Amino acid sequence: MDSLDEEQVSALQKAFDSFDTDSKGFITPETVGIILRMMGVKISERHLQQVISETDEDGSGEIEFEEFAELAAKFLSEEDEEALKKELKEAFRIYDRGGDGYITTQVLREILKELDNRLTEDNLDEIIEEIDEDGSGTIDFMEFMKMMTG
């Protein structure tokens, strides 16, 4: 985690907290994959599992923030904030099918399902409720950015 600056740690903490909906202090390995992919990291399932097994030092199958930050640092060390923002904006634009500056929670649900088909409807509801802070049923770019970068 030493290779991350304060801003990166803060962004990772916010992303971690967004998916740690029960505030248990850990996320699942599947969720790690979702967060990394939403941040623009291209990683195969096999490589992800390998990195997670190396990172999950206590072998709990649950990824605590420290473990998550160390894992993410391996991928973020080459990224800077501007590149991350650009990648997120591009990802958002692709899913903003109407070009009107927002995606519906239904589209976000589809994205999350694509990233991890093991998410249950309850998991998806919790994640979406956390992201769609104003309850509008839509996610604008600022809500999306806030979730991903703080």
From Swiss-Prot:
Q: Which residues form a coiled coil?
A: none
Annotated Gene Ontology cellular component terms: myosin II complex
Family according to the record: Belongs to the troponin C family.
Question: Which UniProt keyword terms apply here?
Answer: Acetylation, Calcium, Metal-binding, Muscle protein, Repeat
Task: Tell me the function of this protein.
Answer: Troponin is the central regulatory protein of striated muscle contraction. Tn consists of three components: Tn-I which is the inhibitor of actomyosin ATPase, Tn-T which contains the binding site for tropomyosin and Tn-C. The binding of calcium to Tn-C abolishes the inhibitory action of Tn on actin filaments.
Ranges for domain EF-hand: 7-42, 43-78, 83-118, 119-150
Disulfide connectivity? none
Pfam family membership, one: EF-hand_7
Which GO molecular function terms does the record list? Answer: calcium ion binding
Name of this protein = Troponin C, isotype alpha
What else is on record for this protein?
A: There are two different troponin C in crayfish.
- Taxonomic placement: Eukaryota, Metazoa, Ecdysozoa, Arthropoda, Crustacea
Q: Which organism is it from?
A: Astacus leptodactylus
Binding-site positions, Ca(2+) 1? D56, D58, S60, E62, E67
Q: Which residues carry this modification: N-acetylmethionine?
A: M1
Sites where the protein binds Ca(2+) 2: D132, D134, S136, T138, E143
